[in-house]
Amino acid sequence: MSSNFQRLSKLLGIAVLAVATLGGCSAMLAQNPTSPLQPVNAVADGAEANLMRKGADLVAYFTENRYVQGSPQFKSRYQQVDFRFASAANKALFDATPQKYQPQFGGFCANGIVYGIPWDSDADTFCMVDGKLYIFGGQGSQDAFELDVPGNLKLAQQYWTSEVAGNNSFWQRSKRLVFRVPHYKSGEQLAQAVAAAKANKQ
């Protein structure tokens, strides 16, 4: 009876979290287009129903190694997802090879995907690994990820492939906030690990 009650409580928790994190149907639809790229870290902005990374110019990460906000003047649509660019030149580069410029894990925080959780990301916190773009939810998330880049990439790829890719980002996030992965660490634990690593380098 106790086991069934705990399971029911967790399932109820998922439902509550899902409702709490939806932030409106438009957000859910924006992140979950009918697309091979689903889910993506996108928002709805006017006529652009699935605007990747709030319009960040993805090409600039590769060509300038920095975050640059795109303009509605230069935009493309690829696999039912909308993209903006800071210049016609960047748009042309993207249109020639759009897959090359896609952020890994749909533009969600790469460190969140390590735990099977598609969290939002901060456009100006990123790194490039082997020519691929990884965006993070903030400097703390990036620092935690970089404690073990090979190991965290392996975990992130595992959870992205087996759980996140092709599925609804809101339900996945809610599920993994209740049913945590075996290696789960809280934000406080990760911050402590980062602080310890920095102290050891001094």
PLM features: residue spans?
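Beta-strand residues in well-ordered beta-sheet regions across diverse protein folds
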Residues: 85-86, 95, 135-137
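Intrinsically disordered, low-complexity terminal tails and linkers in eukaryotic proteins, enriched
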Residues: 26-79, 99-202
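Short, well-structured hydrophobic secondary-structure segments
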Residues: 78-87
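Bacterial N-terminal signal peptides that target proteins for export
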Residues: 2-13
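Bacterial N-terminal signal peptides
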Residues: 13-23
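N-terminal twin-arginine translocation
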Residues: 8, 22-25
